[in-house]
Amino acid sequence: MSEITIRPVLTKADRKAFVDLPFRLYAHNPNWVPPLKDEVHGLITPGKNPWFEHGEAEFFLAERGGQIVGRISAHIDHLALKQPPEQGMGPGCGNWGMFEAEDAAVAAALIARAEDALRAKGMTRSMGPISLAMWDEPGLLVEGFDHPPVVMMGFNSSAYAPWVEAAGYAGVQDLLTYDLPIDKGLPEL
């Protein structure tokens, strides 16, 4: 198997590859709901996303054999650094997110690169996956892969949780969504 190279997103072509990767990875998954590409471009562009007024981010691509096989962000929300640690973030806590990987080796390399980037910025803890803003798409889908995601909830491969756990991460909080068929009226309370 070819060597995995992790490189920063620097050019317009890199940004396009970063945005386009999930479209290839989930092309045959009927439950994946693709985002609007222009919206994702806006999220990762400092002049278009107000999050960058209080945050900073680096974006990385994983490449193997000339093909993009993964992506990740390493980011710091300076407002979150001011929060008490018992609220989940706090001083020294950086984040990684926008995570996609073809396999476990790519996942491990990407997470390690994001952690290195956060350490280089003085962070002493890492939490992820979290999109740039904590309230966009936090965490991993760990069950319900047979349903499309609801608004503001991410979608990922069922392989991701074991890969993230292999990197030393553990779940912090469960976020739940519920589905109720209402075609026959609402149930009695």
Predicted regions located by residue number:
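Membrane-embedded alpha-helical bundles of multi-pass transporters/translocases
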Residues: 22, 53-57, 71
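Conserved beta-strand in the GNAT
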Residues: 61, 67-77
